[in-house]
């Protein structure tokens, strides 16, 4: 039932909306995270260690995923909810 809904036109709009939310969340979180580290600790990107890149990248991914999951609920209701009568 879920796969059938996702393959419909509304399902494709829902998936596109999720992709848009993830991209927006990732760009905002990236800007805040990377900019915060550079401002707070005065460490330019050229001086970052590999572990700093890994930690910051995983933090960006996790936060973006959380925001996407949270916004998937209203998007799912809007796009995949039942038909109003």
Curated annotation (Swiss-Prot):
Top-level taxon in the UniProt lineage: Bacteria
Entry-linked InterPro entries: DUF2534
One GO location term (cellular component): plasma membrane
Sequence intervals crossing the membrane: 14-34, 60-80
Annotated S-S bridges: none
Pfam families (alphabetical): DUF2534
Alphabetically ordered keywords of this record: Cell membrane, Membrane, Transmembrane, Transmembrane helix
Entry's localization field: Cell membrane
Lipid bilayer topology: Multi-pass membrane protein
Name assigned to this protein: Uncharacterized protein YnaJ
Organism in which the protein naturally occurs: Escherichia coli (strain K12)
Gene name as annotated: ynaJ
């Amino acid at each position: 039932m879920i796969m059938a809904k996702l393959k419909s036109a509304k399902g494709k709009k829902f998936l596109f909306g999720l992709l848009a939310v993830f991209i927006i969340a990732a760009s905002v979180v990236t800007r805040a995270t990377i900019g915060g580290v550079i401002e707070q600790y005065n460490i330019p990107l050229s001086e970052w260690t590999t572990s700093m890149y890994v930690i910051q990248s995983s933090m960006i991914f996790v936060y973006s995923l959380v925001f996407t999951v949270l916004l998937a609920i209203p998007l799912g209701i809007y796009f995949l909810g039942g038909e109003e009568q």
